[in-house]
């Protein structure tokens, strides 16, 4: 099991990135909440990881901190929740926000996540309530190298990357394009576009 990787951020193509560890490039998929905390390409980066082994592939998921990684592991233990849905949940809401939804049994935020209807949200919250009684919310999130923007990407490229990232989270192409097109500010990075689009959707 690969539990943590430390190296240099070689590429980022939301929601994927490549981490160069001593010349070996690891491709990881990360939730958007981790993506927002990434340093610039070429900067050092440490990620906590979870490896999923399937018959046709080995998939590596990366997280800003151990607490976030552990939450992901709890989610995929639930009935009907795979890595894709777990990442969609964690991309739309911070871990503390998800825990507060569990504590208050509030389905409204969860039902806005692609693939989560009212009945599914209710079931997830009931199952999670027992699992997370010992968890505490904390304003201090996960330690990671502060984001250092490497300059705005060309608008078309950034927009395309942002739309592709939303589609990978389960949003329909038309929904993704509409959400990105609604952002009026120019010169934003794909990460900033994704963050604003997700806030608007939730």
From Swiss-Prot:
HAMAP family found in the cross-reference section: DNA_HJ_migration_RuvA (MF_00031)
Residues covered by region (Flexible linker): 144-154
A GO molecular function held by the record: ATP binding
Record field: transmembrane: none
Domain notes: Has three domains with a flexible linker between the domains II and III and assumes an 'L' shape. Domain III is highly mobile and contacts RuvB.
Stretches for region Domain I: 1-64
Lineage summary: Bacteria, Pseudomonadati, Pseudomonadota, Gammaproteobacteria, Pseudomonadales
BP GO annotations: DNA recombination; DNA repair
Keyword Ligase belongs to the record: no
Stretch list, region Domain III: 154-202
SMART domains, per the entry: HhH1 (SM00278)
Cell compartments where the protein resides: Cytoplasm
Protein name: Holliday junction branch migration complex subunit RuvA
Designated gene of the protein: ruvA
Pfam families attached to this UniProt entry: HHH_5, RuvA_C, RuvA_N
SUBUNIT field: Homotetramer. Forms an RuvA(8)-RuvB(12)-Holliday junction (HJ) complex. HJ DNA is sandwiched between 2 RuvA tetramers; dsDNA enters through RuvA and exits via RuvB. An RuvB hexamer assembles on each DNA strand where it exits the tetramer. Each RuvB hexamer is contacted by two RuvA subunits (via domain III) on 2 adjacent RuvB subunits; this complex drives branch migration. In the full resolvosome a probable DNA-RuvA(4)-RuvB(12)-RuvC(2) complex forms which resolves the HJ.
Disulphide connectivity of cysteines: none
Species in which this protein is naturally found: Pseudomonas fluorescens (strain Pf0-1)
